[in-house]
Amino acid sequence: MNPFLNTAFKAARRAGQMMIRAAGNLDAVKTDSKAFNDFVSDVDRNSEIILVEALKEAYPHHKITCEESGSHGKAAAEYEWIIDPLDGTTNFLHGHPQYAISMALLHKGVLQEALVYAPERNDVYMASRGKGALLNDRRIRVSNRIELNRCLIGTGFPVVDQSMMDKYLAILKDFLAKTAGGRREGAASLDLCAVATGRFDGFFEFNLKPWDIAAGALIVQEAGGIVTDMSGEDGWLESGDIVAANPKVLAQMLKIISAHV
């Protein structure tokens, strides 16, 4: 584990321990609504404080971009951390174990390091550009399925901005008719890690934020998968529209999506 990932993991583990304690008494967790179906809790905020303080101490010249508190550090910094202190807040608040801490490091705008930590399972996904992806120190690879009708596809519903719900449901209906099934588990970082391990053969979602997808996308890429936007291009981090899959089914997924967008 290189120094960047070591620092990230130590901070994520501390934040994860705090989450596990909080999960034992959810009635005491204070929650606010940022928008319709978009919640934030004091657990999100406390996790972010732990992560930001650790990164600032280790790397005072790095920029840090967070879901809850925005940007820290110089805008022109060569290194930038993108972190989601609690991906899957709604899951967490309902006692569902599918939530994670997501941390990615960019150098001059290029993803270099990624860590996704799932506290309930104590699962640590990580990747370094050009060096592969790991789950709990074991190398992971995307699936090798070819036929779409044998593939399991992950996705996420557009519950915050529902303006494109009809279009999304048309896409989902098409996928459900042509695949082995779909899953909506509520934490994009872990959905992407599921692609990286082969548990999902593909994943798609619209209108996500950089902290939702930056770390998971690099983990998919380093596990042998491909990540694109809905047009098959490389603009997914900017647009928030993402498709991730093993190389053998990506084109089939894009064909279905393109018929509706």
UniProtKB/Swiss-Prot annotation:
Report any Pfam family annotated for this entry: Inositol_P
A Gene Ontology annotation in the biological process aspect, one of them, is: phosphatidylinositol phosphate biosynthetic process
Q: Would the keyword ATP-binding be found if you checked this record's keyword annotation? A: no
Q: Which GO terms describe its cellular component?
A: cytoplasm
Location in the cell reads: Cytoplasm
| Positions bound to substrate | 67, 86-89, 183, 212
Q: Which InterPro entries match?
A: IMPase (IPR033942), Inositol_monoP_metal-BS (IPR020583), Inositol_monophosphatase-like (IPR000760), Inositol_monophosphatase_CS (IPR020550), Inositol_monophosphatase_SuhB (IPR022337)
Its catalytic activity?
a myo-inositol phosphate + H2O = myo-inositol + phosphate
Residues that bind Mg(2+), according to the entry? Answer: 67, 84, 86
**Required cofactor names:** Mg(2+)
Q: Which GO terms describe its molecular function?
A: inositol monophosphate 1-phosphatase activity; metal ion binding; RNA binding
Gene3D superfamilies assigned to the protein according to its UniProt record, in alphabetical order: 3.40.190.80, Fructose-1,6-Bisphosphatase, subunit A, domain 1
Keyword presence, Transcription: yes
Q: Which UniProt keywords apply?
A: Chaperone, Cytoplasm, Hydrolase, Magnesium, Metal-binding, Ribosome biogenesis, RNA-binding, Transcription, Transcription antitermination, Transcription regulation
State the EC number(s).
3.1.3.25
Q: What is its main location?
A: cytoplasm
State how it assembles. Homodimer. The rRNA transcription and antitermination complex (rrnTAC) consists of RNA polymerase (RNAP), NusA, NusB, NusE (rpsJ), NusG, SubB, ribosomal protein S4, DNA and precursor rRNA; S4 is more flexible than other subunits.
Assigned protein family: Belongs to the inositol monophosphatase superfamily.
**Main role?**
Might be part of the processive rRNA transcription and antitermination complex (rrnTAC). The complex forms an RNA-chaperone ring around the RNA exit tunnel of RNA polymerase (RNAP). It supports rapid transcription and antitermination of rRNA operons, cotranscriptional rRNA folding, and annealing of distal rRNA regions to allow correct ribosome biogenesis. This subunit may play a central role in organizing the structure.
The protein depicted here goes by the name Putative Nus factor SuhB
Q: What is the gene name?
A: suhB
